[in-house]
């Protein structure tokens, strides 16, 4: 029977043959998943033998990754904003850039004069935004919506996992339609969303593991990638408080189009958060007033 070090070497070789990036690290993650151990234990236990059953399972998982299945779907987990989230093919895998959106929402909550501000996460998916906000801002009330009931099931599991299930209300429905009949007109302090924004041309250029495995409903935003933004800009004003904010994530090349589209619907961009490549990634907007705020850049 091979030891842990030999198993990783074999797994990494298979992954390298399929041109999987970070092959040895990926093999280590999969072996830890199979054995139920931490990454640090791979070093301290490298000479320890692995059972035949564990070795067979490990290599099956390696072959799944070599075939293009995302690592997060194989292990069922993804870290986001310092928390561990359950993920399945029913939900988009949380991305690091979405952490900028969470950070911005938390800053707005901190600045709010409301004793218990209401935050709505539109299209919650795995629940990574809603759960992260609820965990880190205990005074908030959180609503999370999604058109997919399978996604809501995963989001509710993540809320329970992080002990905030009783503080998040989950609603099924297509964007703002989920709020109908809830007496929420002009009641929301912060509306947050990471909507589908991949356009038709870019969809053909997505990585295979994204295009072939992640839910298209959570990725594709119409011919220009703007369909969901149009709906948000058209309908959200009826639900936000007069001094409320909408916080959205956008694609790497969408700022100019979103700036034009939002202005056409009487929204003003009051803050632009740049990602680590200095690309506009998270926008904070509010309904236009006579005294337009000065645009602020933040990192």
Feature-to-residue mapping (PLM):
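Flexible, glycine-/basic-rich loop-and-beta segments that form/coincide
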Residues: 288-299
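Conserved SAM/SAH cofactor-binding pocket of Class I
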Residues: 97-205
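Conserved Class I SAM-dependent methyltransferase catalytic core
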Residues: 223-286
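Residue-level signal for inorganic ion chemistry
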Residues: 30, 68, 98, 129, ...
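Mobile active-site "lid"/loop adjacent to the S-adenosyl-L-methionine
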Residues: 197-227
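Non-catalytic nucleic-acid substrate-recognition regions in nucleic-acid-modifying enzymes
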Residues: 1-26
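Conserved AdoMet
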Residues: 2, 29-108
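Helix-to-beta-strand junctions that scaffold the AdoMet/dcAdoMet cofactor pocket
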Residues: 164, 214, 240-242
């Amino acid at each position: 029977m091979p030891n842990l070090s030999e198993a990783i070497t074999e797994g990494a070789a298979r992954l390298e043959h399929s041109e999987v990036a970070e092959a040895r690290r990926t093999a280590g993650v999969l072996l830890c998943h199979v054995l139920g151990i931490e990454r640090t234990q791979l070093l301290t236990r490298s000479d320890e033998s692995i059972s035949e059953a564990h070795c067979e399972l490990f290599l099956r998982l390696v072959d799944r990754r070599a075939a293009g299945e995302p690592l997060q779907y194989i292990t069922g987990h993804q870290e986001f904003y310092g928390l561990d989230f359950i993920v399945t093919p029913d939900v988009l895998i949380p991305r690091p850039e979405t952490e900028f959106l969470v950070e911005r929402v938390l800053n707005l909550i901190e600045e709010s004069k409301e004793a218990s501000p209401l935050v709505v996460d539109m299209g919650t998916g795995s629940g990574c935004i809603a759960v992260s906000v609820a965990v880190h801002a205990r005074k908030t009330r959180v609503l999370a919506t999604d058109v997919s009931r399978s996604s809501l099931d995963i989001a509710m599991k993540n809320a329970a996992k992080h002990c905030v299930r009783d503080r998040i209300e989950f609603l099924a429905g297509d964007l703002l339609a989920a709020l109908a009949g809830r007496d929420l007109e002009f009641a929301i302090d912060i509306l947050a969303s990471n909507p589908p924004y991949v356009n038709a041309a870019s969809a053909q250029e997505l990585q295979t593991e994204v295009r072939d495995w992640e839910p298209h409903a959570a990725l594709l935003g119409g011919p220009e990638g703007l369909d969901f933004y149009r709906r948000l800009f058209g309908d959200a004003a009826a639900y936000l408080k007069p001094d409320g904010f909408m916080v959205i994530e956008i694609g790497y090349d969408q700022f100019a189009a979103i700036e034009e589209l939002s202005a056409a619907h009487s929204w003003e961009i009051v803050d632009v958060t740049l990602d680590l490549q200095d690309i506009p990634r998270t926008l904070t907007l509010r309904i236009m007033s006579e005294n337009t705020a000065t645009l602020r850049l933040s990192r």
